[in-house]
Amino acid sequence: MDDCGAILHNIETKWLYDFLTLEKCRNFSQAAVSRNVSQPAFSRRIRALEQAIGVELFNRQVTPLQLSEQGKIFHSQIRHLLQQLESNLAELRGGSDYAQRKIKIAAAHSLSLGLLPSIISQMPPLFTWAIEAIDVDEAVDKLREGQSDCIFSFHDEDLLEAPFDHIRLFESQLFPVCASDEHGEALFNLAQPHFPLLNYSRNSYMGRLINRTLTRHSELSFSTFFVSSMSELLKQVALDGCGIAWLPEYAIQQEIRSGKLVVLNRDELVIPIQAYAYRMNTRMNPVAERFWRELRELEIVLS
């Protein structure tokens, strides 16, 4: 028996479920209650798992408890392994195939509305969908911690390398726009002093891009009027005539065509963006792997 075989021989399946429960609860007491065992027994089982595989899975020096870097990788692998085992058992017993066909995706807010409907409509009817629209940074955390099969997000250097895999979906741009008046002219312009800015949250992906652009162009004089992490909300506030927003091209095409929004033409203020699908580079369950293959072949159409 090789080393890996010996490790597997010494691991009990219940320890793996203990591990997933502790990652979810981030607290030994709560996880022990959830697993219906005493806390000392639960702690011993987690320690036994760590000793069996030879790494510490949790950083116990922080509150709440956090996965270690090795723990994040292990979590993704074990979650997929147990999901596949449960799926196979359900199939053998003639159970519902909903869980077997489910694809779990976490997506940036703007991509969940601007991209996912197009992708789902082009997919074969093999999958059921569980979609969560969240902030970009939170989506990345879910991928790292194995809570999503894949995420739809934006360019991230850290996710373009191992232990991740990626598919480049499309390129787009952020345009500075505002509402039009009754004559079709822009209500605001970038040269006016203290123009009202409708901005993304400071720590969001698009917020960081826009703030870097504003810093480079110190000649712009603005006063932040409204802040949100959601492109659709910023678009609505812009349509209501409240200020200037940088919005993704794919989210405003209809409003530009109808004249409800006006692009404020300053080429140097147009910001390029790239959207990607990311996953862990460990093997997923067969349904998720099929989805990934289909996604690679897909022609992305944004309307």
UniProtKB/Swiss-Prot annotation:
Gene null: resulting phenotype: Controversial. Hypermotility, up-regulation of flagellar genes and up-regulation of flagellar protein FliC. Decreased viability following HOCl stress; no effect on motility was seen in this study.
InterPro entries documented for this protein: LysR_subst-bd (IPR005119), Tscrpt_reg_HTH_LysR (IPR000847), WH-like_DNA-bd_sf (IPR036388), WH_DNA-bd_sf (IPR036390)
Pfam family, one: LysR_substrate
Domain called HTH lysR-type: residue spans: 11-68
CDD domains attached to this UniProt entry: PBP2_LTTR_substrate
PROSITE patterns in alphabetical order: HTH_LYSR (PS50931)
DNA-binding region: 28-47
Biological process according to GO: regulation of DNA-templated transcription
Annotated keywords: DNA-binding, Transcription, Transcription regulation
Induction cue: Transcription increases throughout growth and is maximal during stationary phase. Is not up-regulated upon exposure to HOCl.
Entry GO MF terms: DNA-binding transcription factor activity; identical protein binding; transcription cis-regulatory region binding
Gene3D superfamilies to which the protein is assigned, alphabetical: 3.40.190.290, Winged helix-like DNA-binding domain superfamily/Winged helix DNA-binding domain
Family according to the record: Belongs to the LysR transcriptional regulatory family.
Record's function text: Protects cells from HOCl (hypochlorite) stress but not peroxide or diamide stress. Decreases the intracellular load of reactive oxygen species by up-regulating genes involved in methionine and cysteine biosynthesis and down-regulating Fur-regulated genes involved in iron acquisition. Has also been suggested to down-regulate expression of the flagellar regulon, decreasing motility, but this activity was not confirmed in a second study.
Subunit structure: Forms dimers, tetramers and possibly dodecameric complexes; oligomerization may be governed by cellular concentrations. DNA-binding seems to decrease oligomerization.
Protein known as: HTH-type transcriptional regulator YjiE
Species: Escherichia coli (strain K12)
